[in-house]
């Protein structure tokens, strides 16, 4: 269920601002989005996995908080990230 190292590194490299950037909101939101997409695929097979569904809701809430923070700090970066990841506002 956990993302493998190569997939995680690819997501980080695609959204990092500089070498070794793992803490910026863009990278964190991108990692959470990848994890959420992975879990939604899991739920297509395992419809009654309610325990993991609560974890999914926590991840979605965490992503929402980071997006709200980014929107408050820099609207241009927020809009660019939303468009790049294909998320709704």
Curated annotation (Swiss-Prot):
SUPFAM superfamilies for the chain: S15/NS1 RNA-binding domain (SSF47060)
Keywords associated with the record: Ribonucleoprotein, Ribosomal protein, RNA-binding, rRNA-binding
Domain of life: Bacteria
Biological function: One of the primary rRNA binding proteins, it binds directly to 16S rRNA where it helps nucleate assembly of the platform of the 30S subunit by binding and bridging several RNA helices of the 16S rRNA.
A Pfam family: Ribosomal_S15
GO cellular component terms, semicolon-separated: cytosolic small ribosomal subunit
Organism: Nitratidesulfovibrio vulgaris (strain ATCC 29579 / DSM 644 / CCUG 34227 / NCIMB 8303 / VKM B-1760 / Hildenborough)
NCBIfam families: S15_bact
GO MF entries: rRNA binding; structural constituent of ribosome
rRNA-binding as UniProt keyword: yes
Entry protein name: Small ribosomal subunit protein uS15
One of the protein's GO biological processes: translation
Protein family membership: Belongs to the universal ribosomal protein uS15 family.
The gene coding this protein: rpsO
Record carries keyword Nuclease: no
Complex formation: Part of the 30S ribosomal subunit. Forms a bridge to the 50S subunit in the 70S ribosome, contacting the 23S rRNA.
């Amino acid at each position: 269920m956990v993302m493998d190292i190569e997939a995680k590194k690819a997501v980080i490299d695609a959204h990092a601002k500089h070498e070794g950037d793992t803490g910026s909101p863009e990278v964190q939101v991108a990692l959470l989005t990848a994890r959420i997409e992975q879990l939604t695929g899991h739920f297509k097979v395992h419809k009654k996995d309610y325990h993991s569904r609560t974890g999914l809701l926590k991840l979605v809430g965490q992503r929402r908080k980071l997006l709200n923070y980014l929107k408050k700090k820099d609207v241009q970066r927020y809009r660019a990230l939303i468009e790049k990841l294909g998320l709704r506002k």
